Amino acid sequence: TEALIGKFTSEFQLGAPSADVLWISSVPVSLRKEGYLAQYHSSEIAAIPKSVLEVFNKPNGYWYPGIMVLYVIGVNTKHVPMAEAPKSWKDLTDPRFKDKIIYADPNFSGDVLRVISTIGTKLHNWDFYKKFAANNPMIVRGHGQVQTFLESGERPIAGEQGHQRLLNSKNKGNPIETVWPEEGIIVSPWSFAISKKAPHPNAARLLI
C-alpha cells in the first residue's frame, strides 16, 4: 500500500497519472485532504449499510467500501497442534513461541500498521511489542510470504494474517487453522477511490 500510494502521488504531481482508480488497504483520508481524489456520488451507495460506512470513516463520495479483511492468527497444525497454539494476541509474547512466528513488514503494508496500532493502543499497550520482539519473529515483506513460511512449517505461526488466505490454504489441503483471538479480531477496510486526474474518468465512475 505504501509503495502504491507513493507511485500514485508522484505520477499525480508530475502530471502523468497512469491510474484512474486506487484500490488500497486503508481509508485514504490524507489523500482527500491533499487534493488527490475526485468526489463522485454513486447511486449504489444507498445499498451500503450505514454501519459499514461508519467503518469506512464516512467517505462522502471520495472513496467507496471495497472489502473488509479480518486479521487473525494462523497456525500450521502439523508443527503446532491447536491445543498448544496461541489463543490470543497476548499469547504471541509467550516464550514458548520463540522462533516460530512469521509477521509482515509494516513498512510495506497498511494493514500491518493497523494491526500494530490496534494491539499497541487499544487491545494492549506498546510494551506488548517489546515482549513480542523477544520471541524473534521473522519479518517478511508481505502476506504472501507470510503464507509461504506458514505453509512450509518453517515458521508455523502467522502472528497476523487475513482469514481468507488461511481459509483458502486450508481448502487446498494444507494443515492450516485459524485462531480467533480472545481479545477480538482486527478489521482492515479496503477502499476504492477515483483520482482527480484520472485519464479515463467516465470509466472510473462506471467501475465505482
Model-assigned labels for residue ranges:
Residues 12, 123, 169:
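Active-site catalytic pocket residues across diverse enzymes, especially alpha/beta-hydrolases
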Residues 182-187:
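Short, surface-exposed loop/turn microsegments at beta-strand edges and helix-strand junctions
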Residues 28-31, 156-175:
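A ligand-binding cleft/hinge motif common to bilobed small-molecule-binding domains
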Residues 87-96, 190-208:
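Bilobed periplasmic-binding protein/Venus flytrap-like ligand-binding cleft at the lobe interface
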Residues 72-79, 117, 188-203:
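A bilobed periplasmic-binding-protein/Venus flytrap-type ligand-binding module shared by bacterial periplasmic
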Residues 39-43, 176-181:
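Short hydrophobic/aromatic-enriched beta-strand-loop microsegments
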Residues 1-9, 17-154:
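Extracytoplasmic ligand-binding site segments that recognize negatively charged/polar headgroups
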